[in-house]
């Protein structure tokens, strides 16, 4: 078989062709990823109404963009999220905020790569915030072990990349901010770094006070 010979002229041609094609393939993959990001960035719209089951309770909240805030009656992390939306309610520089859902096409989702499983998945950041100056914030609140998990590291990277992309994608009139949010010493901090890390009681310089976003 002439293809099995080490000095085969056909093997050399095929190898050369593959090498020449590799940059083209990489460019096509990059382009498809950019187009996918663009579609994801353009399609999310807050719906005028949502359906909820009996597992949810309705709360009267001033700055929530919906007429009422609907939360599950019981779930892990509810205490932390309740503290956070009460904190948002106190901020004069916020026009409105939205509590995102955790599944389904009607809610904002971001694709991320699960580094341990080597698979792709989607997550739903908890909060979308509209500031009075037009800035849009996308934040995900964490507490305890969820703040230190490898899954949160992966999500933080994806959220950083999405915010970075939105700010570079012909959106000069809109500024985007976002990151992972934790409470430390009765204060809220966020991390928008691509190299996310968290250690309880020892926040690195990548953690910024949420107050800096509201002093406008």
For the regions a language model picked out, list residue spans one by one.
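Electrostatic, structured charged patches in enzyme active sites and in nucleic-acid/phosphate-binding
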Residues: 1-216
